[in-house]
Structure formats: C-alpha cells, structure tokens
Amino acid sequence: MSNILQERLKNKKIGVLSGPSFAQEVIDYKPTAVVVAGELETIEKSTELFHTPEFRVYGSNDIIGTSVSGAMKNVIAIAAGIVYGLELGENARAAILTRGLAETAKLAKGLGGQTETVFGLAGAGDMALSSLSMTSRNFSWGFSLAKKQPFDDKLTEGLNSSKMAIKIAKKIKIEMPITELVSKADNKNFDLQTEVENMMKRPPKLEWF
C-alpha cells in the first residue's frame, strides 16, 4: 500500500504507523507503544505529532517489513481464534503465534523487508495483542468459524490479507501453511479440525529453513 501511495502521489514522504494498539485503549490514554516506518524526516515529523507520555512512538526505516507485519498479524489472529475455538489448547495457540511470526518473517524478507522488524512492535507486539484477545475482530472471527457461530462484523481484514499473501508466497516460492489454511477458512466445505490435523502431519523440518 505504501508503495502504491508513493507512486500515485509522486511523494516519498510516506509513513506507516503500526503496533499493538487497540483504539479504545488509545482513546482512554492507556500506555501504548507503536512504530512509525519511513524516511528520517517522516519519522521525526510523526514523532513530533504523535509522541506523548501515554503514546510512545519508535522509528524504523523498514516500510516493507512494517507493512507486511501489520497485515499478517490479522491473518495469524484468525488462525489463533480457530485454534482457540477448536479447544486445541494453549500449546497449540503458542505454536500458531510463533510459526505465524516465522511465516511473516519469510514473507517480509522475500519482499525486501527486514526480518528483525517482524519481531518488534509491528510484528510480534501487534500479533500477540491481536491473537490473544476477543477484542480483536480477526481473533473473534476465527473463533466463531471454529464454533460454527454467525459473525456479523465485516471488518476482518485477515481473510483478504491471507489470500493476497498466498498469491505472493507462490510467486516468491515460500511455504506459508498457516496463512494458506486461513485463506480457505471461508469455504463452507472446509473442515477446520481436519485441516489443522493435516497441517500438523506435514513432514518435519528445521525451524528456520
């Protein structure tokens, strides 16, 4: 998205603000830390505008990694909701979160981003927040899918993000099994329990290869 804006606006002064920040808590002045990615001038201006004692702003030059992390946290939140809804246990939810970070890191690196960004506020921070709370729309949607319950909120960005991520993953030849599962989760004939079991039956491999 940031690349599209830069191209359309003919302006490199684009910033990406991301991080663990439920809107209501920001409104209520609860302590929050986020990251703004962009060129130095953009970081300095954004920090000047947004940084307060309650809202801490860190800087990053990694727009790609920050953007990918912000999109993928919604995908992994859906997966975490599915695991929670299927009552597969806390071990499974922790595994989904950790392997979700690995998938995000591979995607970010493949697109030219920095893997360390994925383990900062935009990635691990936001992913943890979104994957461990019913306040997260994406987590709640995944939970509702697993429970076969209706869910009216249409602001579940993770489904569309997962479909786009899989298209990119195929082009750059990386595996993203959790993301792929989420991308098919809206299929009425898709049995989530079976698909999670199949994912666990994949051949063993080294953690980071």
Whereabouts are the PLM-identified features?
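NAD(P)-dependent Rossmann-like dehydrogenase/reductase catalytic/cofactor-binding core
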Residues: 73, 80-84, 109-209
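Conserved beta-strand segments of alpha/beta enzyme cores
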Residues: 13-15, 56, 175
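Rossmann-like NAD(P)(H) cofactor-binding subdomain of soluble oxidoreductases
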Residues: 1-29, 47
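An active-site-proximal "capping" alpha-helix that borders the catalytic cofactor pocket
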Residues: 98-111
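Short beta-strand and adjoining strand-loop segment in the mid-core
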Residues: 27-44, 80-90, 94-95
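Short beta-strand segments
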Residues: 15-18, 35-37, 79, 122
